[in-house]
A protein has these predicted regions:
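Conserved small/polar residues in nucleotide/adenosyl-binding loops
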Residues: 273-279
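Membrane-proximal, proline-rich intrinsically disordered regions
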Residues: 22-69
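Conserved, well-structured interaction surfaces
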Residues: 85-155, 185, 203-207
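Short coil/linker segments at helix-helix boundaries
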Residues: 154-188, 192
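Sec-dependent bacterial lipoprotein signal peptides
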Residues: 1-20
């Protein structure tokens, strides 16, 4: 009997040790990844992270297709061919539990999280201050404003319906954990956050042309659009007029219009994204 008791005690102790070892083993970070707070340590890392921010905009569930086609086929500009797996639900407005387009919510928040990881690293003080770093921070803030703007367009009533009193999308300005469940903010709160990010970005970004990236003129262009949706027409006009009068961008002349389509960027390309992103300037 004593022998059996010792045997059971030994087995129980072995299980306990095994479970403790297992816990430690399962807590290990993957060998092919870094924690977000350790992955951005210098200006080169900042450039790579910023390119990752922009690449998220190009998802087929965002600017790569769905965000554009949703508006086009939802109005009267474009009629979808049937059957069309990508645009038919938008065109017919046939949203069910098993086919509702979740990407228009998921992808912008993925991009926002990338922005917040980058901003957390920049604001930690561990990266040497420089104009490059300021510019990268400004670009990241502008992208976050763009994503928040789009989320409120899709998931909130137009601002002018009730001065933004109705619910829109949650404002996320920090790196989230798996347990975080931010509540929806009002549309007015969303616009306030958008305008704050754009105002800060405007004081940080360069005024030089860097195709595929936000600069001063692209931020002003987004500000103009935000003010237009908000009904602040004087402010929208002022932003647009500044771009027209002071920026290096010019309208293409009639004689050059057809040839311009053979180029990825033109003198009119104030705010564009592209598939192969250059490093930050």
């Amino acid at each position: 009997m004593k022998h059996n008791s010792l045997k059971f005690l030994f087995i129980a102790a072995s299980i306990s040790i095994g479970l403790s070892s297992c816990d430690g083993y399962l807590d290990q970070m993957p060998s092919n990844a870094l924690p977000s707070d350790e992955s951005i340590n210098n200006i080169e890392d900042v450039g790579s992270a910023l390119n990752g921010v922009y690449s998220g905009l190009l998802s087929s569930e965002y600017y790569g297709a769905d965000f554009i086609s949703r508006a086009e086929v939802g109005g009267e500009d474009v009629q979808t061919s049937t059957p069309s797996k990508r645009t038919e639900n938008f065109y017919k407005f046939m949203y069910r539990q098993n086919n509702a387009p979740t990407g228009l919510w998921k992808i912008p928040y993925q991009v926002i999280n990338r922005v917040n990881v980058l901003l957390q690293a920049i604001e930690s003080g561990k990266i040497t201050a420089s104009p490059q770093l300021d510019n990268a921070k400004g670009e990241a803030l502008a992208v976050r404003a763009l994503c928040n703007f789009n989320l409120n367009i899709v998931y909130g009533y137009p601002y002018q319906k009730d001065k933004g009193a109705s619910l829109g999308a949650p404002i996320v300005e920090k790196v989230l954990t798996a347990n975080d469940m931010p509540a929806r903010n009002t549309v007015a709160e969303g616009y306030e956050a958008i305008e704050k990010d754009l105002t800060t970005a405007l004081g940080l970004v360069s005024d030089k042309v860097n195709d595929g990236h936000f600069n001063k003129w692209a931020v002003l262009g987004l500000q103009a659009r935000v003010y237009l949706y908000k009904g602040n027409y004087d402010a929208a006009f002022n932003c647009a007029e500044t771009i027209i009068k002071e920026s290096p961008y010019k309208l293409i002349q009639n004689a050059d219009y057809l040839a311009a389509w053979s180029n990825e960027y033109t003198s009119e390309s104030v705010s564009y994204t592209h598939l192969t992103l250059p490093t930050i300037a």
